[in-house]
């Protein structure tokens, strides 16, 4: 029900680039992720609370995807059943 939908997934020069449409339950509408192996190289949200999504992206850069999943899974926003951080964890889970 809350799973993000993979829009694209490709590998260029060893960097995996994937885009996901987020659940309608959250303010962001898309997450773009770059992975180098199992490490997050960068990520960017489209829409959402700009300061918060920038903060999430900055904190996650350089982290192992599994560690981000462990920290962000299940975070809820306004009793919606998911959140922008949870959507990232769900998207990363699809990539691992």
Residue ranges and their predicted role:
Residues 22-30, 34-96:
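Active-site- and interface-proximal helix/loop "cap" or "latch" segments in soluble metabolic
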């Amino acid at each position: 029900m809350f799973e993000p939908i993979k829009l694209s997934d490709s590998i260029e020069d060893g960097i995996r680039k994937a885009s996901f449409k987020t659940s309608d339950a959250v303010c962001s509408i898309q997450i773009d992720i770059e992975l180098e192996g199992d490490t997050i190289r960068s990520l960017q949200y489209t829409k959402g609370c700009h300061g918060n999504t920038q903060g999430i992206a900055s904190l996650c850069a350089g982290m192992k995807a599994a560690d981000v999943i462990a920290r962000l899974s299940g975070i809820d926003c306004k009793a919606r059943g998911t959140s922008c951080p949870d959507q990232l964890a769900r998207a990363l889970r699809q990539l691992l």
